[in-house]
Curated annotation (Swiss-Prot):
Gene3D superfamilies: MFS general substrate transporter like domains (1.20.1250.20)
Transport is among the record's keywords: yes
Matching InterPro entries: MFS_2 (IPR039672), MFS_trans_sf (IPR036259), Na/Gal_symport (IPR001927), Na/Gal_symport_CS (IPR018043)
Gene: yagG
Topological domain spans for side Cytoplasmic: 1-9, 52-78, 128-150, 201-262, 330-366, 427-460
Protein family (similarity comment): Belongs to the sodium:galactoside symporter (TC 2.A.2) family.
Membrane topology: Multi-pass membrane protein
Protein name: Putative glycoside/cation symporter YagG
Transmembrane spans: 10-30, 31-51, 79-99, 107-127, 151-171, 180-200, 263-283, 309-329, 367-387, 406-426
SUPFAM superfamilies: MFS general substrate transporter
Key words of the record: Cell inner membrane, Cell membrane, Membrane, Symport, Transmembrane, Transmembrane helix, Transport
């Protein structure tokens, strides 16, 4: 099997640094931007997140079907990075622009730009996420590739947490509307450049012909009959929902519960560093264990850490910082494993039915992710609206403070319990995955299919 170089790993990972600008901005900044800068109410924001994300999620399987049927001189997946980079940067910037419109006009503008943002993210991210299957066929190399991917994705998070807010202050000079727009201009342009770097440095080493007799209905029916795909999608929906609830509550937690808004940049920065190194250490720390068993134990560990943060008095700032750093390091050792699940399900489906559905599996995985994103974003907005959170109040009532703590610490733990249950039903252990990989390699060799394609690999 192909041994990946550092160029392969870093080149691929930089694509998720670019995607991370949008993902992390949506997770950590957009809720605050919409309520406190743009001027939306929390209730409208929550509804916008839900409706926009559900509409967008429907396009993910359609994108997957398109990817599975795309073959160009640049390969199957890489062309979408080339075509989508510039629209990606433009829409990212427009989402954080505050127009001088009426209240109704602003709502319409927010809906249009947010939907466009999620659509262009889908156009780039679905094929990007599906690429590991044609970069390498080795499960261990895929783990290493995903570790570097999420290390560099966390660099995108670091840019948001460590650079975005200072840029807002520097560019805006007290005007947050100008500041957010200017900061996202810088980050959007950087994202375009990084997507092009990813395009030129990655290689699709394996090619698969479009399989005869395929149809949308047949492909969807196959996946619906795949128990491991169903478990994977339910798992990812809960995992994403937990991330978004916690991430969406982060700035509120620092500003109101800890009562130190000036520490927001440091809180996000240190958390991003922990995220980076947790992802990078994943294959080294967990590679020696069965991935499913290790994942379950890690869920227990970070659930306990989250509950410790909940019971820690707000005045113990250093302890909260330390626990948050520990939480994010431990949590993110499992992030590469989440995406390995999708690659494993692709191989499992091929061994089960003979159909290789990289695009459809990863797009439906992203569909689950976006449903989780929609629910999580809506939960934050609706619950804050229910307890009468007001952005104009510098001091929040005790009920609001307690609710923010619950959103940050307790609601995610409930979802972690659901993730644990899903993993208890998941059967694609290391031994099973390696056996499937060997089986597929023998079958392809016998059929003369999917051998490394030097011409395709060299096509940049």
């Amino acid at each position: 099997m192909t041994q990946l170089t550092m160029k392969d790993k870093i080149g691929y990972g930089l694509g998720d640094t670019a995607c991370g600008f949008v993902w992390q901005a949506t997770m950590f900044l957009l809720a605050y931007f919409y309520t406190d800068v743009f001027g939306l109410s929390a209730g409208i924001m929550g509804t916008l997140f839900l409706v926009s994300r559900v509409l967008d999620a429907v396009t993910d399987p359609l994108m997957g079907l398109l990817v599975d049927r795309t073959r160009t001189r640049h390969g199957q997946f890489r062309p979408f990075l080339l075509w989508g980079a510039i629209p990606f940067g433009i829409v990212c910037v427009l989402t954080f622009y505050t127009p001088d419109f009426s209240a109704q006009g602003k709502i319409i503008y927010a809906c249009v730009t947010y939907i466009l943002l999620t659509l262009v993210y889908t156009f780039v991210n679905v094929p990007y996420c599906a690429m590991p299957g044609v970069i390498t066929a080795d499960p261990k190399e895929r783990h290493a590739l995903q570790s570097w991917r999420f290390f560099l994705a966390a660099a995108g998070s670091l840019a948001i947490s460590g650079i975005a807010l200072p840029l807002v202050s520097i560019i805006g000079k007290g005007d947050e509307q100008v500041g957010y727009f200017g900061a996202m201009c810088v980050l959007g342009l950087s994202g375009v450049v990084l997507l092009y770097v990813c395009f030129f440095t990655t290689k699709e080493r394996y090619t698969f012909e479009v399989q005869p007799g395929s149809s949308v209905a047949k492909d969807l029916k196959l996946l619906l009959g795949n128990s491991q795909w169903r478990i994977m999608c339910a798992f990812k929906m809960m995992a994403t929902c937990s991330n978004v609830v916690r991430g969406g509550a982060t700035l509120y937690f620092v500003k109101y519960v800890m009562d130190h808004p000036e520490l927001a940049t440091q809180f996000l920065l240190y958390g991003s560093l922990a995220t980076m190194f947790g992802s990078l250490c994943s294959s080294r720390l967990l590679g020696r264990f069965d991935r499913v068993t290790a994942f379950k134990w890690i869920i227990v560990a970070y659930s306990l850490i989250s509950l410790l943060i909940f019971v820690t008095p707000a005045e113990h700032i250093a302890l909260i910082f330390a626990l948050n750093i520990l939480f994010l390091f431990v949590f993110n050792t499992t992030t590469p494993l989440q995406w390995l699940m999708a690659s494993d399900v692709v191989d499992y489906e091929e061994s089960r039915s003979g159909r290789r559905l990289d695009g459809l599996v990863f797009s439906t995985y992203l569909f689950s992710l976006k449903i989780g994103l929609a629910i999580g974003g809506a939960v934050v907005g609706w619950i804050l609206a229910y307890v009468n959170y007001s952005a104009s109040s510098s001091v929040q009532p005790v009920e609001v403070l307690t609710t923010i703590k619950i959103l940050f610490c307790v609601v995610p733990v409930v979802l972690y319990a659901g993730m644990f249950i899903m993993l208890s039903l998941y059967k694609l252990t290391d031994a099973r995955v390696e056996a499937i990989s060997r089986q597929l390699i023998k079958h392809r060799a016998a059929q003369g299919e999917a051998v490394p394609d030097a011409a395709t690999a060299a096509s940049h």
